[in-house]
């Protein structure tokens, strides 16, 4: 989804063929892409919102971050010790590195979305598995945009944290 152009008007099949031709993906990667699942997502409400954000230049993909968090903050997010790769830089600070799949800015806040392909049976299972990660990523975005304002002049904050399960074909609020 990193290269997908939501506002192009092209079908997923056409876009995947173009990505292969432009060497953005390999033939092996193309073989793993399930076109109907991509089409379903792109035509969903969230996919359409992403298209609108893309048109206005406010869709951001694969954004890396490195940020320090206190142990208390990590505990509040639900991170237990050894649940992810963390680097302790001092007694008070742990350095977290991550890559945000996609986020976009709407008139009243930031929407954070993480794509998932896990084999799960329920939304709850996926939500519980990734809640801490999305809280942490949301806080990272809040810090990055702490001096920005939304269209109403309010501080720009993450307003929605979402997972999209390709397996379940669902957007899951977290």
Model-based region annotation:
Residues 1-85, 89:
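A non-catalytic, helix-rich entry segment at domain boundaries
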Residues 73-174:
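Mg2+/Mn2+-dependent nuclease catalytic core
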């Amino acid at each position: 989804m990193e290269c997908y152009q939501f506002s192009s008007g092209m079908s997923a099949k056409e876009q995947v063929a173009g990505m292969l031709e432009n060497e953005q993906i390999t033939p092996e990667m193309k073989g793993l892409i399930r076109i109907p699942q991509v089409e379903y997502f792109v035509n969903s409400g969230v996919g359409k919102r992403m298209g609108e954000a893309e048109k206005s230049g406010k869709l951001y993909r694969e954004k890396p971050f490195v940020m320090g968090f206190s142990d208390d903050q990590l505990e509040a997010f639900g991170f237990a010790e050894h649940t992810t790769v963390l680097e302790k830089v001092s007694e008070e600070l742990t350095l977290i590195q991550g890559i945000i799949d996609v986020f976009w800015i709407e008139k009243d806040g930031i929407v954070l979305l993480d794509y998932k392909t896990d084999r799960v049976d329920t939304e709850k299972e996926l939500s519980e598995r990734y809640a801490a990660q999305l809280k942490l990523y949301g806080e990272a975005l809040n810090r990055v945009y702490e001096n920005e304002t939304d269209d109403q002049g309010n501080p720009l904050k993450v307003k929605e944290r979402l997972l999209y399960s390709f397996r379940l074909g669902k957007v899951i609020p977290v």
